[in-house]
Amino acid sequence: MPNDTNGDDYKKLEKASVNLNFLKSNSHTHIGPLSAIAELVDNAYDADARDLHIDFLDINNEQFLELRDDGLGMAREEALHAITFGHSAKCSYKIGRYGNGLKSGAFHLGRELLLVTKKDGIITALLISHRFHEDQGLTNSVFVPCPSFDLDGIPICQTESEKDRFNLEMKIIGKYAPLGSRTLAELADKITGSTGTIIIIGNLRRSVTGELAINTTKDPTDIIVDSGEENKPWRESLRKYLEFIYLKPRMRIHVRGEQVLPKRISENWIAKKQQLISGDQFTAAYNKILDEKNETVKKCEEEKALVMSEIGGTNYTSVRREDRANQKSLRLRVDTSQKNLDSAIADRDAFKKEGKSEKSFHLNMGIETKDRSNNGIHFYINNRLILWGNKEAKFFSKFANSIGISMFLSLDYSLFSAAQNKQGFDHVKDFQVLVRKCNDALRDYSMYLEKSWIPTHLKNTWNVRIYEGDDVWAVLWGVYGYNNTTSTTCVQTHDSARDQVMWTTCGIWKLCQMCRTWIKASRPNEIVGSNDDFFCCENVNHHGCRTIVAEDNDFSKLPEKYDHILPQKRLTNSAPSSSDSQNSIRSASSCSSSSRLLNVAKIESHERIHSSTGGHRLGESFSTTSVKMEPIPNNAHDSHIAEVQRRHSTGRAISPAVSEISRRAGTAPSSQLDMIMGEESDESQEALTIRAPRQRAKRPIERVSRRNRRDQSDDDSDSENEERYATAPKKSKVKGKAVVRAPKMTREKWLEEMLNQFLTAHGEQPLPKNGQRDFDPTNIVEQTSRRNFKNNQRIVDAQQAIMRQIGSVLDHLKRNPTHNFKIPASGTVEEKLKNIEHQIKGKKK
């Protein structure tokens, strides 16, 4: 800029209350670019904007961020208040409270800020430029050009000094503002409505390598930052972050030309419960806000007194015309200051009255079923996200099955105040107390789920029952498509039947683009034209917005008392309970971490030729869907032909696979496990049976001498007693009758024994003692199945040989009507056929 402007001329400009160094340090309150952009988004939200457009522009090799909204806009006085650090005239229900977001957010992203706003037919521009201050050597103060003009471009000026200031401001903006190749008038034309605001940030922040701090090339419809947390997309993607930033998204947000589709935080939650918490003990935020409001009233009083002192007792008839114009301007300032004072007093009094009322809030809890690793506690203050997925509560570190369990809180600013960057809480002690209350509620909630809700839900919704020893969490996650209970990387399997149940349980939530209300449908076909960009209430009820009741709160109260649903007992009593079988098998066999279940593989259909007496025609196929687990010895194929046929024809066969739900949950049903482990054979082998000792009532012990005992018995018993006493070891005292009990066996020992029988039956070596072994049960069963198939094939070969023999006889009889064959009167059919075949071959020779 040519040095044709004196330093004194800059005194005509508006001046901020801080210096340039504070402006730089204040920008570091944000943890990253997404946090800074969110601050600017909050300003549009608080201005009741319906639409916000966030764009990245590259004009003449200059990069800019542009945010354009159709909110209330600002007059010149309101725009100047924006550069007063720490000032905020927003109501208590608004998101922004510190009056600092515009400056801190903008200068975290870049070094040049241009604001253009429109209200009441007046356009106002405001520029804060680092480059301008550095070029002019202005480091002690922040000078802010802030010209105003009407829709025709005519400046709003009352005096000659105001005109001079306007010209100077336009000159500085023309040189230092981040306009690119555009003019200020062209930029103002982009505000098409009667009100609105445009924020342009230039000279964007770069890394030490010269690259932009934001990535705009990875996704043309998004703004990406490198946070180093790939498993948390809301830390890297502006679009993902904005999907959850507001509980009630009243404003449409467009990022680089494409609308952000908000997500309802609990749309995929089940078991939605809430607990009411009193806020009486949280007073730090209230006291701080009250002090701020008292300070605002005091400043307004001082401002009014200052203006009144400038007016004094001047007589309008004794001054010049220009002085009278200045006096008129002062009178307007008095009116404005009085309005500000009245507004501040009314706001403070309303806040006091509201503070006397009882404060409470809800802890909303549920189980996330679609993205269960994206759980934790989500804190919102005044409808705005503060912390997402917080896991400071001990519940998440001490409770193994905490994955998927989530909670969100919608807090009021009068109880809790956010930090300046809205990435945490302002009062640490209050936050710690709040976390402890959340921890207690989550502990009660998980107990309720495990003891009551999950068993009832599985029975009523999925027709799945819980048996003694079953891991209810494993069964629950199994039916919802997760084969691992605690892994955060486990991916949910897709199932259309499960989707149908989810639609009924959770509903399908859509945000109306007209009234911005969440609408719930239970089936996809209830929604006509399901394009989210244009969805409105009319797509559901065909009558217009708000004609149906939206279920904004579908959480019920967490019961303090509830019925404990006891697990059912298993039908089998021949062995210890096989619940927790998966974990027990792992410990007994020291298997690898693959955690494969002992499932019987499903055997594919094979071709089988039955004899005429078997009820099947020659060449007819049959399907084998199950197979006995014990292999048929290779050296006894012929002796087992009838047995194999009997086993295939009867229903006494092992189920081809463990129940799908139990397989996903990580446990096998007791009946299936018993069949796999115990029912090795119907006739050839005896299953190992260990019966629990019968409980007997204790009897008083009689001390009977050996002689008397012999006298009380007959001769036969005497001989038996003599033989028994002759062989039994001598004891000093006999206190009671010895009871022969079955040897006790722990669950691990029993499972190991069953597993060894399983391996031995399939021709495998048993588990080594005090050793480890890795094996694949599915592969073992498949090998046995292949051997059984070979045995079946031998049957088929024998039948085919018989058919060939019969064919030879029939062919010969057809060619020779008369024959002199000697057909044996006795013998099997096979022997008779062989005899006739030998006779035929002898005649041929």
Swiss-Prot record:
Gene transcribed to yield this protein: morc-1
CDD domains: HATPase_MORC-like
Class of the enzyme per the UniProt entry, highest EC level: hydrolase
Protein name listed in UniProt: ATPase morc-1
Subcellular location: Nucleus; Nucleus, Nuclear body
Function text: Binds non-specifically to DNA and forms static foci which grow by recruiting other morc-1 molecules, and thereby stimulates conformational changes and compaction of DNA, which appears to be enhanced by ATP-binding, but does not require ATP activity. Preferentially binds to long DNAs. Compacts and entraps segments of DNA by sequentially forming loops along the DNA, beginning at the free ends of single- and double-tethered DNA. Does not extrude the DNA loops on compacted double-tethered DNA. Involved in gene silencing.
GO cellular component, one term: nucleus
Binding site for ATP: 43, 88-90, 97-103, 422
